[in-house]
A protein has these predicted regions:
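A composition-driven surface/loop motif
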Residues: 2, 7-11, 31-239
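N-terminal secretory signal peptides that target proteins for export/translocation
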Residues: 1-27
């Protein structure tokens, strides 16, 4: 661990030597400069990538693209610069009715969020369990088993822009659309890269059922993914 003294000596060198074997301190201006530079260097050395775990039971979560990471808001409190946003349930066996909104407003915006053993049932909320808005690029990384269920006419995941869902061989996602809604809906492009993804369209509810997966920008499946799409009440598996 570097000390202020060692860093200051690196910046200015050792004290001045005068006759008689007595060291003369550096001028005050140089000592002040050393302290400023040392503090700046220590701040840089001690600044790790910031990450936080967000429990969905504590309230709705909104994630937006920021200059140095994600800006995450929950219960009207915003954390800036989160570079590894992880959303989870405190008890994955009990579904939460709170929802996740991801905002990648501009086409150059990039947002990455990890869902870790998330269990959301928003069937009482009149909205999607996970909504992705804007024209930017969003990546949802899967960690563990994740389940999303939405209300009538709301998809399990509803997305605009470019959406990528990624995971490993032991990671999974089940997205259940509400009545008349798709399991996964994207008005942009959709890429599924790795993991096991099951998308179920909702039942008709007196009208048309929902597709398992519907994307106006096309669907790309890669990375050893296992994808199952089930349309509801005679609807297409893929729309």
């Amino acid at each position: 661990m570097l000390s202020y003294r060692k860093l200051a000596m690196c910046v200015l060198g050792r004290p001045l030597h005068t006759g008689g074997g007595i060291d003369s301190p550096r001028p005050a201006s140089q000592r002040a400069a050393a302290l400023v530079l040392t503090a700046a260097m220590l701040t840089t050395l001690a600044a790790p990538a910031f990450a936080d775990i967000w429990h969905i039971e504590n309230g709705d979560i909104t994630i937006s693209a920021g200059e140095s990471g994600n800006n995450v808001t929950q219960n009207n409190n915003t954390t800036y610069g989160d570079t590894n946003t992880i959303i989870t349930n405190q008890n994955k066996d009990t579904a939460s009715s709170h929802t996740v909104t991801i905002e990648a407003k501009d086409k150059d915006d990039k947002v990455e969020v990890t869902l870790k053993d998330v269990n959301i049932d928003a069937s009482s909320r009149s909205e999607a369990a996970v909504s992705v808005t804007g024209s930017g690029n969003t990546t949802i990384k899967l960690d563990g088993d994740n389940a999303l269920k939405s209300d009538i006419y709301s998809s399990g995941i509803s997305s605009s822009g470019s959406l990528t869902i990624s995971g490993g061989e032991n990671d999974s996602l089940t997205a259940q659309g509400g009545s008349g809604a798709d399991g996964i809906y994207s008005s942009g492009s959709l890429t599924i890269s790795g993991g096991t993804v099951t998308a179920n369209g909702g039942s008709s509810g007196g009208g048309d059922g929902g597709d398992g997966i519907w994307s106006s920008g096309g669907v790309t499946i890669s990375g050893g993914s296992t994808v199952t799409a089930n349309g509801g009440d005679g609807k297409d598996d893929y729309g």
